[in-house]
Curated annotation (Swiss-Prot):
<feature type="modified residue" description="Omega-N-methylarginine">
    <location>
        <position position="142"/>
    </location>
</feature>
<feature type="domain" description="SH3">
    <location>
        <begin position="754"/>
        <end position="816"/>
    </location>
</feature>
<dbReference type="GO" id="GO:0045597">
    <property type="term" value="P:positive regulation of cell differentiation"/>
</dbReference>
<keyword id="KW-0728">SH3 domain</keyword>
<feature type="modified residue" description="Phosphoserine">
    <location>
        <position position="84"/>
    </location>
</feature>
<comment type="similarity">
    <text>Belongs to the iASPP family.</text>
</comment>
<keyword id="KW-0804">Transcription</keyword>
<dbReference type="Pfam" id="PF14604">
    <property type="entry name" value="SH3_9"/>
</dbReference>
<dbReference type="GO" id="GO:0003229">
    <property type="term" value="P:ventricular cardiac muscle tissue development"/>
</dbReference>
<feature type="modified residue" description="Omega-N-methylarginine">
    <location>
        <position position="144"/>
    </location>
</feature>
<dbReference type="GO" id="GO:0060048">
    <property type="term" value="P:cardiac muscle contraction"/>
</dbReference>
<feature type="modified residue" description="N-acetylmethionine">
    <location>
        <position position="1"/>
    </location>
</feature>
<feature type="modified residue" description="Phosphoserine">
    <location>
        <position position="102"/>
    </location>
</feature>
<dbReference type="GO" id="GO:0042633">
    <property type="term" value="P:hair cycle"/>
</dbReference>
<feature type="modified residue" description="Phosphoserine">
    <location>
        <position position="315"/>
    </location>
</feature>
<feature type="repeat" description="ANK 1">
    <location>
        <begin position="655"/>
        <end position="684"/>
    </location>
</feature>
<feature type="modified residue" description="Phosphoserine">
    <location>
        <position position="183"/>
    </location>
</feature>
Length: 824
């Protein structure tokens, strides 16, 4: 009984539905007849207006007027009724399933229809809860209906495949797209001309077919100009629907007229009417870098000015319609609205162009300047390698710039520091106005060394050093000057670099690079510069000449050399070794040296008298200065001797630079191996946060990177200036980039996966929250999860039976083994 009653009720409901549907079809037929009559009347009026002109121009020129009249018609005909391209029966079926807005009887039957497809931009008002099942993709940044809208057939794929054959010949695709893909924030559609291209979410593979077809305007049903994708004004959209129905009207004359109106000339006129207001804001052309430039200059500050892939389209009101997508894109790490997409989403076949909109930091480019470009600006012969091929011996002198390199006048840096060393020297130096040739080699060096970093011009020491050497051509050729430490040197740019437009950006990047890289960047110079002879054992020869007897130079030579070198080295070393300068000139020698110098030329030293029972203290160079300089120049024996005299081989200078930094930047592999074996800290950062691994990565030196990683280098250590890891410092414009970047990427991926997820703590860490783990240096931690959405910098790990979050940048793939070396 229940089933029979249910069947009876269902039949009754079907009958009621059919009767109401027939009534609705009759209503639609009446509306259609009214529209046809109005069309006939308007056609007659247009024919009477254009009777004086030839027929074809009249037919073509009549289209805009007809479109305007239809768009402003007071008859309550909406998109579904006026633009229906189907037959009468088909239109009735469409109307039964919710194609009309004007029929008030639509609402009681909308819940019964699972195929409701509203076509108005304001359709969310009429949607019932049941219809959301097929329209839940409306707010999506990738509406499916839009893919079909740009297809060659001009067909919008329906959520239900059964309705497809009925809607196949219809040209009302743009309005289905407006209906289904319209966001609840769709009110800006009527404010002005705009391109209704959705700002897609950051998908790595956006569908290219729909955009390519629309971008090239190759659709056969969209007219010659692709007018269906022009800014969607309602008048234009209504005329688009009424302009190209294949078979909708019964009047054959009107059919022929409408077929003529769909020619190219009519579409051109329509483009002139509707696309000109939109052209200043957005050019509907295939995507180019200039499109983004145009957008940046139009004053749309809220637009994302990033370099988008080729398949992306941009809308002037993209942030209004897709603000959620924009916020998601901005949350991916960009500093502001001008940030770029992540590197993995950028097209690899194109170099991204910098946007023209003002940047927050007023920097003209989005990605950092490669080191090779900076090296090229520092040295005009970087590409040719002329300096390295011609200049022999140790590279310390080959790094010297020509005397007239800086734009500042060179005599002033030489003459200003003259009063500085005089008060520090003993009376013996003040009483010697006339000095022989060897003093001319050492005195200017002392002047440059005693200058404070604030007074230093770009590398004035080398500049001061070269000028007297050229003047003293008759001096002893065996005299070898002591090489300078890179710790006090500043970057110097050649004259041709002044014409580079990115000079300010280069200077900013240079200020963030550690001194060893700056020093390494000026290695090769012009071979035409006259340089003094170079030798491998420079330090040993200097020490032998200073502290051992031999009959080469006169008595006046060693006297200024001794005091000057000592004071210069101690001034360079600064606070670490303040004691040696005081006892170097004993009280007795200064009393005897002023009268003895003009009288007797037999004296070879001022340290002690011949036959003196007291053994005078010898001058001693700071081992830190020796270590830093020898590590850069590649003198392993000097490095070994200096390390023996130091407690810590990783002792930094005032800028945090260690001997390991210098050895890596100088590509001195034996010294790197020796320092690591001696217990040097492979994670010692300088004042900019650059670890030795950053320096090795910037040189694309895979061998040194491997050695550092295997001895406990921190893979995820970041710099202070830009927060970059080692892999981000690899130079893509230099040889070895692929190998070095691949190795570092493999190491990053292996962290927490290799060795059963075991990583080794490189520093101590105290937990700040309850879900974190505390650990000490050297402890092994097992990583349990590292790919969570909130675990980019924190990994879930276990230690001593407890689980919690640990910072990934505190760990290395291998432990750092400290050498048990005792001081000698």
């Amino acid at each position: 009984m229940d089933s029979e009653a249910f069947q009876h009720a269902r039949d009754l409901l079907d009958l009621n539905f059919q009767s109401l549907a027939m009534k609705h079809m009759d209503l639609k037929q009446m509306e259609l007849d009214t529209a046809a009559a109005k069309v006939d009347e308007l056609t007659k009026q247009l024919e009477s207006l254009w009777s004086d002109s030839p027929a074809p121009p009249g037919a073509q020129a009549g289209v805009p007027s007809r479109m305007a009249r239809y768009s402003t018609s007071p008859v309550p005909e909406h998109f579904g009724s006026r633009g229906s391209p189907q037959k009468i029966a088909t239109d009735g079926i469409e109307a039964r399933f919710g194609r009309s807005e004007s029929a008030p009887s639509l609402h009681p039957y909308s819940p019964l229809s699972p195929k409701g497809r509203p076509s108005s931009p304001r359709t969310p008002i009429y949607l019932q809860p049941d219809t959301y099942s097929s329209l839940d993709r409306a707010p999506s940044p990738r509406p499916r209906a839009f893919d079909g809208a740009g297809s060659p057939h001009g067909r919008a794929p329906s959520p239900r495949p059964g309705i497809g054959p009925v809607r196949q010949p219809g040209p009302s695709t743009p309005f289905d797209y407006l209906g289904r893909a319209g966001s609840p924030r769709g009110s800006p559609l009527a404010e002005g001309p705009q391109a209704f291209f959705p700002e897609r979410g950051p998908s790595p593979r956006p569908p290219a077919a729909a955009y390519d077809t629309a971008g090239t305007f190759g659709s056969p049903l969209l007219g010659a100009g692709g007018s269906a994708f022009t800014p969607p004004l309602r008048a234009q959209d209504d005329s688009t629907l009424r302009r190209r129905p294949p078979k909708a009207w019964n009047e054959s004359d009107l059919d022929v007229a409408y077929e003529k109106k769909s020619s190219q000339t009519a579409s051109y006129e329509r483009l002139d009417v509707f696309t000109r207001p939109a052209s200043p804001g957005l050019q509907l052309l295939p995507w180019r870098e200039s499109s983004l430039d145009g957008l940046g200059a139009s004053g749309k500050d809220h637009l994302t000015s990033a370099t988008l892939p080729r398949n992306y389209k941009v809308s002037p009101l993209a942030s209004d319609r897709r603000s959620d997508v924009g916020s998601y894109r901005r949350s991916l790490g960009s500093a502001g609205p001008s940030g770029t997409l992540p590197r993995s989403w950028q097209p690899v076949s194109r170099i991204p162009m910098p946007p023209s909109s003002p940047q927050p930091r007023s920097t003209p480019r989005q990605r950092p300047i490669p080191l090779s470009m900076i090296f090229k600006l520092q040295n005009a012969f970087w590409e040719h390698g002329a300096g390295r091929a011609v200049l022999p011996g140790s590279p310390i002198f080959s790094r010297a710039p020509p005397p007239k390199l800086p734009p500042q006048p060179p005599p002033q840096p030489q003459m200003q520091p003259q009063p500085q060393p005089q008060p520090q020297m003993q009376p013996q130096s003040q009483a010697q106005p006339q000095t022989p040739a060897p003093q001319q080699t050492w005195s200017p060096m002392n002047e440059g060394l005693l200058k404070s970093p604030a007074e230093l011009e770009p590398e004035p020491e080398l500049e001061v050093l070269l000028a007297p050497v050229e003047e003293a051509g008759d001096a002893d050729e065996g005299t070898v000057t002591r090489p300078l430490s890179p710790t006090r040197l500043q970057p110097a740019l050649p004259p041709e670099a002044q014409t580079v437009p990115e000079l300010e950006e280069v200077a900013r990047v240079l200020a963030e690079i550690p001194r060893p890289l700056k020093r390494r960047g000026s290695m090769e110079q012009s071979p035409a510069v006259a340089l003094p002879p170079t030798h491998k054992k420079q330090y040993q020869q200097i020490i032998n000449r200073l502290f051992h007897r031999h009959g080469g130079p006169g008595p006046g030579g060693p006297e200024p050399e001794l005091s000057t070198i000592t004071e210069g080295s101690e001034a360079r070393a600064g606070p670490p070794a303040p004691a040696p300068p005081a006892p170097i000139p004993p009280p007795a020698p200064p009393q005897s040296s002023p009268p003895e110098q003009p009288q007797s030329m037999e004296m070879r030293s001022v340290l002690r008298k011949v036959g003196s029972p007291r053994k005078a203290r010898r001058a001693r160079l700071n081992p830190l200065v020796l270590l830093l300089d020898a590590a850069l120049t590649g003198e392993l024996d000097v490095v070994q001797q200096a390390v023996k005299e130091m407690n810590d081989p990783s002792q930094p200078n005032e800028e945090g630079i260690t001997a390991l930094h210098n050895a890596i930047c100088g590509a001195n592999y034996p010294i790197v191996d020796f320092l690591i074996a001696a217990g040097a800290n492979v994670n010692s950062p300088d004042s900019h946060g650059w670890t030795p691994l950053h320096c090795a990565a910037s040189c694309n030196d895979t061998a040194i990177c491997t050695a550092l990683v295997q001895h406990g280098a921190a893979i995820f250590a970041t710099t202070l200036s830009d927060g970059a890891t080692a892999i981000e410092k690899c130079d893509p414009y230099r040889e070895g980039y692929a190998d070095c970047a691949t190795y570092l990427a493999d190491v990053e991926q292996s962290m927490g996966l290799m060795h059963n997820g075991v990583v080794y703590a490189l520093w101590d860490y105290s937990a700040e929250f309850g879900d974190e783990l505390s650990f000490r240096e050297g402890e092994s931690v097992t990583v349990l999860r590292r790919d969570g959405p909130e675990e980019t910098d924190w990994w879930w790990a276990s230690l001593h039976g407890q689980e919690g979050y640990v910072p990934r940048n505190y760990f290395g793939l291998f432990p750092r083994v400290k050498s048990q070396r005792s001081k000698i």
